[in-house]
């Protein structure tokens, strides 16, 4: 004697898993979009520093923050 037949429960479980998975992906996607904006600013700074200081790429970390 079951309360709900398995035919009605299985699609609800599948729908629940899909919804939870989509929420997890959406939250991760927002983090990656924000991080991409930060990386773009860092790359811009490296290009500007290379033009200003004329330093090779390996030396930019040493020159960052100095004026």
From Swiss-Prot:
Coiled coil (UniProt feature): none
Where's it found, cell-wise?
Answer: Secreted
User: Where does tissue-level expression of this protein occur?
Assistant: Expressed by the skin dorsal glands.
Q: Which residues carry this modification: Pyrrolidone carboxylic acid?
A: 50
Q: State the disulfide connectivity.
A: none
Q: Name one GO biological process term.
A: positive regulation of muscle contraction
* Organism superkingdom: Eukaryota
Q: Where is the signal peptide?
A: 1-30
| One GO cellular component term noted in the UniProt record for this chain | extracellular region
Q: Which UniProt keywords apply?
A: Amidation, Amphibian defense peptide, Cleavage on pair of basic residues, Pyrrolidone carboxylic acid, Secreted, Signal
What does this chain do? Stimulates smooth muscle contraction in isolated rat stomach strip.
The molecule here is called Bombesin
């Amino acid at each position: 004697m079951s309360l709900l037949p398995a035919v009605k429960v299985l699609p609800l479980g599948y729908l629940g898993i899909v919804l939870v998975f989509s929420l997890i992906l959406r939250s991760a996607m927002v983090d990656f979009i924000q991080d991409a904006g930060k990386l773009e600013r860092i790359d811009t700074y490296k290009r500007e520093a290379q033009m200003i200081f004329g330093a090779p790429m390996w030396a930019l970390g040493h020159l960052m923050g100095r004026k």
